[in-house]
Structures are given as C-alpha cells and as structure tokens.
Amino acid sequence: MQFVSVDAWGKKAEYIRNGLNFNYMMDNVDEFLDRIPVRNSVTFIITYNNLSVTSLDKLLEGILELRKRHSKTYQRVWFDIPLLRQPAWQQITLLPESYQAIHEANIEYMRENSGEEKGLHIFKDFEIQKMLRNLAYWRKNANASTQNKKNFYAFFNEHDRRRLTNFETVFPEM
C-alpha cells in the first residue's frame, strides 16, 4: 500500500504543499497502479482544512475516476479525510457557515456514487460517514475568532512573500 498526502486539487494542492507538481503526482499514482496490477493499493490522505474545501469536489471526482480505471477485482484506491486540528487558524471551523454548503454538496455527490450494486467504483458508507462526522464537528465547533482570522491573514501573507506565491490568485473564492 502506498500513501499519498494531498489536501486539494491542482494548483490549490500545489499551494498547500509547496514544491508539489500535482499532475506529475497523479501521473505517478496512475503509473503505479498500471505497472503493479495486483496486491497493491493507494490511499490518499486528505488532511481536511480550510484550504481544502473549495476543491475537494474535484479530488473526489479524481479518486472515483481512478477507482473506475484500476479497481477491477478489489478496491485499489482508498482515501481518508482526517481533520486538521492545528494550527487553529487553518481549521475548517474558521470558515463562514456558507462554506458548509460546499461540503454538503460533496456528501451528496458521494451518496449519488455509492451503493454495492455499482461494484467497486463507488464511495463506501464509511467514507460518507467520515464526511458527515467532519460536518458535525464543523457545525459544533464553528469559531470565526478575530485572532484566528488575523493569524490566517498574517501567515499566508508571509507565505506568499517567502515563496513568491499569491494566495488570492490560487484561492480567488476565499
């Protein structure tokens, strides 16, 4: 089993994980699954944070596509979605309540692509339950603290200065 740590899709993933070439990584995942067709799998570890929310839909679609392409006799593509707890200013709980609708739409997409009758090319019940658990935590612990917002702003301003990146270009919706 190989583990792939990625928290978003495309340029957003590259921003979060400085130095990542997202397309190269996905090509390598595909090649690994092609070249070693038996007794292996890939697990995506998605550390769910406030920068993950707006592109998780594309990442879920990518995971489902990999399942369709590579899971013929057993599940070869997995994912886990633990919540980021620290730093507090990067938790999903800092986001406005309106972002929960994005998360809910992802849960609905997963439900539409679940069900044992569809074989291996589905989202499992326990994966949907993890997403529901994350939503429940978010609702219970929503915390738009002014200090956390200041820390978020300060961190990513410094991040952009040091790494020559641009938060507003990569995350215009935020």
Where are these regions (language model features)?
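Radical SAM enzyme core and accessory elements
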Residues: 104, 111-174
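Radical SAM/AdoMet-radical enzyme domain recognition
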Residues: 1-84
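Flexible glycine/acidic-rich beta-alpha junction loops that bind and position SAM and/or redox cofactors
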Residues: 48-54, 72-105, 116-119, 124-135
